[in-house]
C-alpha cells in the first residue's frame, strides 16, 4: 500500500505559483472577440506591508476572476500601486531615506507578499502611479483639460493642513480634520489649480440612476447628498445709500441664493461668511473698533470643525440692505455658520423657518416673523418651522401653498428683473494643488510675458528632481536651486516652473483605464482605444465604502472627461460595485496603535495561503464586517486537511463518470444531492450574491455526505465537482489534487444533473379527525392500499378500539381517518 502523502501547503503553494508564472496563465488574451470580464480591486498604497483588509479585498476579486476564467471568459484582473503621496515624504523625514527609494522598496516587498497568496493578477500590466510613463500621460491629460477650460487657476480660501503643510479638497476634510493625519484643518487663502468638476455636477448626479441595483444604495445616497442639487431663487440685496458710502462706493450689494423664496417676507437680517469681500473690506477700513475686528478675525482663524462645533456667533457690520419687496432696511451681520463656498457666501435669514437662523436670531434678539403656517396645528415658538405649509404675513402670496408661493415669487422676480431661478449644487470644484514633493508635477510654467502657460507635449514628462532634501518644512520643489527655472514654451524667455504637485487622487481617477489599455502600447499612448473600449467599463469593482465620495466620485468625473476628450466610450467607469466590510479583531479595526494587527505573513507561514483565503471568505459575507478568530482559522486548516486525506481514496478520472442514479442507495443519492446543490449554489454566489461563505458551507456538507457512503463513482464525481468549486477560493490545493486525480480537466463549466433533485419519496401527514398525529415517508410506486396500511400502523394507538367511519387519502399530501367517539 502506497504511503499517504502529507498536506504541505507551503511546498505546493510555491510549486503552483511558479507554474502559473511560467505559463502566464493569468494574462488576458489578445483575442478581443471573446466575451470579457474586467475584475478590479482597488489598488493599494505601498506602505510596506499588506494587511488583512488587503487579503480580504483581493481574495474576493481573485475568486471572481478565477471563476470567470473557468467559465470561458477573457479575464482582465490587474494590480498596481497608488504610489505617490505624503506617507513617503513622512517616511523620508523619519528614516532619512529618499521617498522614491522607500516607495519602490515597499512595492517590491508587497509584490512578493501578494504573489505568496496566489492571486491571479496580470503581471504584465502591473503599474505604479509614480512611474515616469504614468506621470507623462497624466500631465498630458492635464494640458488637454487646461485647453478645454476644465482646469483653471485662482486665489481661493482653501483647507490647509498645518501638519502636512498642504491643501486639502473638501472631500478630504472629515469633521474638520485632515483625512490622512487627523489634525485640524484651517482656512487659508492661496493660489491653486482646480478641476472644473461642477461642470459635470448634473450628469454626475443624474447618472447615479444608471447604477441603481448595481452599486450599494448607501454609496449612491452619499454621492447624491455630496453633490447636493437644489433649486431656488438667486437675487441681489442692494445696500442702502449710507452703507454704500460706508464701503467707499466699492460695493452696491450682494447676491444670495435661497431654496425657499416663499419665505422672503420673513427676512429679518442677512448674514455674510467671514471670508466675504464686504467683510474683508470693513476689516481693512477704520469703521470697526479693535474688539469687533478681533472677534471677526478669531472666527476667520477657526477651522471648519471648530465653527461647526461652536455656538452660533457673529457681529453686526453696521450696514443695511433694502428688502426687494417691502423696501425695509435689513441689517447685515457676519456669522460663523455661513460657508464661504456655498452659493455666494451670503444668506437671507428667515429665523422663523430655518433652525440655524433661529438660533442666531434668538442669541442676538433679532426679530422672528412667521410667514408659513403649518397645514395642521400650530408651529412651536421654541424652534423654527422648516416644513411646507401656507403663506401668511406675506402681502403678495398670502393663502398660497408653499409650492405655489415659491413659483409665484420666482416668476415675479424674473419678470421684474430682480432675480432668476437657478440650480445650485453643494459640490465644489476640485482643488488639486499640493505643496509637496512626492507627486506628479503640474505641467505649467509662469512667464512674465505670457502668464500661465502649459508645457509642450514633447517635453513630458516633467519629472521630479531627485536631489532634494525632505525636511517637512515648506515645499522642496520651491526651494530647489535649479529645477523650477526653465524657459517659456510659448515665447522662449525665462520662466518659473509650477512647484505644486497634483493631488494623489488624480492618479487613482484613471488607473482603471490604463490597466485596460494594452501594455504593449503604454510607451506610445495614454490609452489604446481598441483595447480600452473592449475592456471598459469595469465589470466588478471592489473596495471600501470609505471611498464613496472621494475616489469613486473623482473616478466618475474623470471617466466623463476622458470620454469627452475622445479617449473612452462609456459614461460610467464601474458597472458593479462591491464594498467589503472591515476586518476587525476584538471588535475593533486592526491597527498598530491598538496592538491588534494580524500579519498575513504569519498566517501564511503557519497554515498556508489557502487557509488564509478560505477563512477570509468563509468567516462572513463580503459586505459585512469580519471578526478575526484564531480558532476559525484552525478550523479552515482542518477542513483542507480533510480534503487532502479524502483525495487519497479517490480514483483517477478525466471526465465525470456515468452514474445510474436510480440504482443508488439512499446515502449515495443523498451525497449526489449535496454535490449538485453546491454546484447550483456556485452559480448564485459567483453570479450575484458573492456570499462565498454559503458556497464553502455547501462544499463542506457535500464532503461530509461523500464520506458517509463508499461508492467509488460517487466519490470521484463529488471530488471532481468540489475541487472545481473550491479552486477560485483555495487554488493551490485544488490545482494540486486536480492535477493528481483529474489532470486539471475538471476546471471547466460543469452542468447540473437535475435527476439528483427528483425526490424518491414524499412525506405524508396522517390525521385522525383532522388532527395531525404522525408523518411517514412513501415512495412514488406505492399504491393507495399499501399507503393506508402504513398510515394505520403509524397512528395505531389513536385508532385502537375505535370505529373507523371513513378513510380519506389525498395523493401526495395526507391520510385522514374519521373515527367514531
From Swiss-Prot:
Its EC number is 6.1.1.4. PROSITE patterns: AA_TRNA_LIGASE_I. The keyword Signal does not apply. Disulfide bonds: none annotated. It is an enzyme of class 6 (ligase). It is found in: Cytoplasm. It holds the Pfam family tRNA-synt_1g. It comes from Campylobacter concisus (strain 13826). A motif ('KMSKS' region) lies at residues 589-593. HAMAP family: Leu_tRNA_synth_B. Coiled coil: none annotated. It comes from the Bacteria. ATP binds at residue 592. One of its GO terms (molecular function) is ATP binding. Keywords: Aminoacyl-tRNA synthetase, ATP-binding, Cytoplasm, Ligase, Nucleotide-binding, Protein biosynthesis. It catalyses: tRNA(Leu) + L-leucine + ATP = L-leucyl-tRNA(Leu) + AMP + diphosphate. GO terms for cellular component: cytosol. This is Leucine--tRNA ligase. A motif ('HIGH' region) lies at residues 44-54. Belongs to the class-I aminoacyl-tRNA synthetase family. GO terms for biological process: leucyl-tRNA aminoacylation.
